[in-house]
């Protein structure tokens, strides 16, 4: 059972205050009620948001409110080091045994999101997947967006059983839990300084080192295309 958790959010030119507030509200409830829950005892958490050298000053200023939230810290970094290096940095900064990595452009769609992860068996890596918003307004707004059309047509990212059939290939860094010791021993390859592929290579690293990935049905929402 997971009872200590560092929630780690890398961000770049994106205000993620609402995401952090949603996560903090769930974590705070678990923290305050942990003594009375038979399945979760002495729950401790932190939420760290690392700004990877954002160039938009309004974005940086907007995210500074995160520092006023309990158990939350907004870390401003001047240099843009890329998706792999910023995740490795967050892992080093974290103080708890388990790390939950979330992309800053995701949104929480379940009130039980954190509780679902805490109840999972202690697999070294657990991936929850993501869910594309498919309401009428979003479909109309993005009807000519090729990436949205492609992602919406797919189902495997929302179906954990299909993902589990090919666990290392169907893995993304947008929503997963990992033991801190695993990531420190097998960090992301920092040669990937731009968008993409760091999760593909890390999946291969896990496979080569016989570290299993458990796929579960615990998605975050995604609508930024």
Predicted regions and their residues:
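Acidic donor-binding loop at a coil-to-helix junction in glycosyltransferase catalytic cores
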Residues: 195-202
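Conserved donor NDP-sugar-binding/catalytic core segment of glycosyltransferases
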Residues: 111-143
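Glycine-rich, basic loop-to-helix element that forms the pyrophosphate-binding segment
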Residues: 77-94
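A conserved hydrophobic helix/loop-capping motif in glycosyltransferases and polysaccharide synthases
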Residues: 5-22, 26
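Short, flexible, basic/aromatic active-site loop/helix in glycosyltransferases
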Residues: 146-168
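Active-site donor/metal-binding and catalytic loop motifs
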Residues: 193, 211-225
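Short aromatic/hydrophobic "clamp" motif used to bind/position activated sugar donors
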Residues: 99
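Acidic donor-binding segment of Leloir-type glycosyltransferases
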Residues: 23-76
């Amino acid at each position: 059972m997971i009872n200590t958790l560092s929630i780690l959010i890398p961000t770049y030119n994106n205000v993620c205050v609402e995401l952090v507030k949603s996560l903090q509200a769930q974590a705070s409830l678990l923290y305050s009620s942990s003594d009375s829950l038979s399945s979760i005892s002495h729950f401790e958490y932190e939420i760290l948001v690392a700004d990877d050298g954002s160039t938009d000053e309004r974005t940086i200023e907007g995210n500074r409110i995160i520092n006023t939230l309990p158990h939350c810290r907004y870390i401003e970094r001047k240099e843009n080091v890329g998706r792999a290096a910023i995740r490795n940095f967050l892992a080093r900064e974290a103080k708890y045994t388990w790390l939950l990595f979330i992309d800053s452009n995701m949104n929480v769609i379940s009130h039980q999101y954190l509780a679902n992860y805490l109840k999972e068996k202690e697999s070294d890596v657990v991936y929850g997947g993501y869910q594309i918003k498919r309401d009428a307004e979003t479909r109309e707004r993005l009807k000519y967006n090729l990436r949205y059309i492609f992602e919406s047509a797919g189902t495997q990212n929302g179906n954990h059983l299909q993902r589990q059939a090919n666990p290392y290939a169907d893995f993304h860094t947008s929503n997963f839990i990992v033991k801190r010791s695993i990531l420190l021993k097998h960090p992301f390859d920092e040669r990937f300084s731009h968008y993409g592929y760091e999760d593909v290579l890390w999946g291969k690293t896990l496979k080569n080192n016989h570290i299993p990935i458990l796929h579960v049905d615990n998605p975050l929402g995604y609508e930024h295309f």
